């Protein structure tokens, strides 16, 4: 035979007692402040879910080094030049003008400037690879000026 529970000896709470209990649980405020949503999807636990507007974008937060590794992989896959062509061409022309003199008026073929740029970028990439190895050898991950100096000294072109 099933047992039927009888009413307990606790009194039934009145509406004023319920209101006092709700204020106590609510921290003293009976109505929620607008914009103070803390539940799932920005709502209080009893509220119906609302749809967030589509124009609010949350900025993605990556762990330290994740974006750097992604950039390294992207640049290792690609074969395009990393230095912009026109600033490099201006630099080459300025250095040649300072070295030879402005009165000669040297002209440059675009292929000659492009060949110089390819050689410069290959040199810099190789130097930075050696510099990174020097930093790793020193149990560091950050390259420093002394790593570049050591790499150039070991290579023999100071």
Curated annotation (Swiss-Prot):
Q: GO molecular-function annotation terms?
A: DNA binding; protein heterodimerization activity; structural constituent of chromatin
Enumerate composition-biased segments (Polar residues): 1-18
- SMART domains linked: H3 (SM00428)
Basic and acidic residues: bias regions: 20-29
Q: Which GO terms describe its cellular component?
A: chromosome, centromeric region; nucleosome; nucleus
Q: PTM per UniProt?
A: Ubiquitinated. Is degraded through ubiquitin-mediated proteolysis when not protected by its association to the kinetochore.
Subcellular localization: Nucleus; Chromosome, Centromere
Instruction: Map out region (H3-like) in residue numbers.
Output: 54-157
Q: Which UniProt keywords apply?
A: Centromere, Chromosome, DNA-binding, Nucleosome core, Nucleus, Ubl conjugation
Disordered, as annotated region: 1-59
Pfam families from the xrefs? Histone
User: What is stated as this protein's family in its record?
Assistant: Belongs to the histone H3 family.
**What job does this protein perform?**
Histone H3-like nucleosomal protein that is specifically found in centromeric nucleosomes. Replaces conventional H3 in the nucleosome core of centromeric chromatin that serves as an assembly site for the inner kinetochore. Required for recruitment and assembly of kinetochore proteins, mitotic progression and chromosome segregation. May serve as an epigenetic mark that propagates centromere identity through replication and cell division.
Task: Summarize the subunit comment.
Answer: Component of centromeric nucleosomes, where DNA is wrapped around a histone octamer core. The octamer contains two molecules each of H2A, H2B, CSE4/CENPA and H4 assembled in one CSE4-H4 heterotetramer and two H2A-H2B heterodimers. Interacts with the inner kinetochore.
Could you identify this protein by its name?
Answer: Histone H3-like centromeric protein CSE4
In its UniProt entry, the species of origin is given as Millerozyma farinosa (Yeast)
């Amino acid at each position: 035979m099933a047992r039927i529970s009888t009413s307990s000896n606790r009194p039934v709470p009145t509406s004023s007692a319920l209101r006092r209990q709700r204020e106590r649980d609510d921290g003293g405020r009976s109505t929620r402040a607008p914009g103070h949503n803390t539940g799932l999807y920005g709502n209080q636990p009893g509220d119906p879910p609302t749809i967030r507007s589509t124009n609010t974008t949350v900025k993605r937060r990556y762990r330290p080094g994740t974006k750097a590794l992604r950039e390294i992989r992207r640049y290792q896959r690609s074969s395009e030049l990393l230095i912009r062509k026109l600033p490099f061409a201006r630099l080459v022309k300025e250095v040649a003008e300072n070295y030879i003199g402005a009165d000669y008026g040297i002209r440059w073929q675009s292929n000659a400037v492009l060949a110089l740029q390819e050689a410069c970028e290959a040199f810099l990439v190789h130097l930075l690879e050696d510099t990174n190895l020097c930093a790793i050898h020193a149990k560091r991950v950050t390259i420093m000026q002394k790593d570049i100096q050591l790499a150039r000294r070991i290579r023999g072109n100071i």
